[in-house]
């Protein structure tokens, strides 16, 4: 619970409400959504992680700097970072070679398995297994986007709660 206390203290300055929730294990959740810098940072960190889009060179510090400078506001912004090449090269510990490697890694991440993309979105309750099941069932992201609540609950391991999280996303 020490980390929870630290998180609460860090969020007091935002004036956002902190909710305590009890599921299988207790955790806290900021109600600020995309207004909460920790939530935004966490979403991007998850998106670029090895199990998701697997983008090398976009660690927490770099992500934080890019978010702070306004270069990244949503996931799609990562794929136009080429437009900020000079700005990227001016970041601390980020020279031409680092930027070149990062942009190459971003390009490579454009052709990953569908389940990894679904997982990368960070939809609440959708882990790797559920993402695989969704990819196997629907075959394309467009088909998943067009799916109904009823279609979703037919997928292996997806019940009403998870189906609601997906449709709400």
Description of each model-found segment:
Residues 1-169:
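Accessory alpha-helical DNA-binding modules that contact the DNA backbone or grooves
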């Amino acid at each position: 619970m020490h980390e929870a206390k630290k998180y609460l203290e860090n969020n007091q300055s935002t004036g956002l409400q902190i909710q305590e929730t009890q599921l299988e294990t207790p955790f806290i959740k900021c109600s600020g959504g995309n207004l909460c810098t920790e939530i935004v940072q966490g979403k991007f960190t998850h998106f670029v992680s090895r199990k998701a889009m697997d983008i090398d060179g976009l660690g927490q510090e770099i992500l934080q700097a890019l978010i702070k400078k306004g270069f990244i506001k949503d996931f799609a912004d990562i794929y136009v970072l080429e437009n900020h090449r000079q700005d990227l090269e001016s970041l601390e510990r980020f020279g031409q070679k680092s930027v070149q490697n990062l942009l190459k890694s971003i390009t490579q991440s454009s052709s990953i398995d569908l389940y990894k993309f679904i997982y990368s979105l960070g939809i609440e309750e959708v882990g790797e297994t559920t993402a695989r099941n969704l990819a196997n069932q629907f075959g394309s992201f467009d088909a998943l986007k067009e799916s109904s609540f009823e279609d979703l609950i037919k997928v292996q391991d997806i019940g009403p709660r998870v189906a609601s999280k997906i449709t709400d996303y």
